[in-house]
Regions:
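Acidic, proline/glycine-enriched N-terminal capping motif
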Residues: 1-126
């Protein structure tokens, strides 16, 4: 859903999306620094993403074939790793060359959230 504000289209859930991206960035940045990884990464990378969604009381499907759309979730992660200002995990989100993404329902002990792995693509020629 979008809303028109000051002549510009804006996502109606923009504030929540901004907070979510900030949390994803903070977790990824701190993980990279904790592993002594120099950021921002400036080579080809692959992402492995598992979006863990809350399980409804009566799910229609055994997997979350429901909103939010997987492609939009993946895009939000790319945007989170490469914010428009400040420090970054990736120099550019165009450095993402492979994505393996899944949506699953949360089951104890796994809580809703995001599991994210970023790895460099080996064999890059200079």
């Amino acid at each position: 859903m979008v809303a028109l504000r000051n002549g510009h289209l804006r996502h109606s859930k923009g504030a929540a999306l901004t907070r979510w991206r900030a949390l994803v960035f903070k977790a990824a940045y701190e993980a990279a620094r904790g592993l002594n990884v120099d950021v921002p990464l400036d080579g080809p990378v692959r992402l492995r993403l598992v979006f863990v969604l809350p399980r409804p009381k009566r799910p229609r499907f055994w997997v979350p074939a429901v909103k939010p759309d997987l492609d939009k979730l993946v895009r939000a992660v790319g945007d989170a790793l490469c914010p428009s200002s400040g420090p970054r995990v990736l120099r550019e989100d165009s450095r993402i060359v492979h994505v393996d993404a899944h949506k699953v329902y949360a089951d104890y002990p796994i809580q809703p959230g995001l599991l994210c792995w970023v790895s460099s693509v080996e064999g890059v020629r200079k």
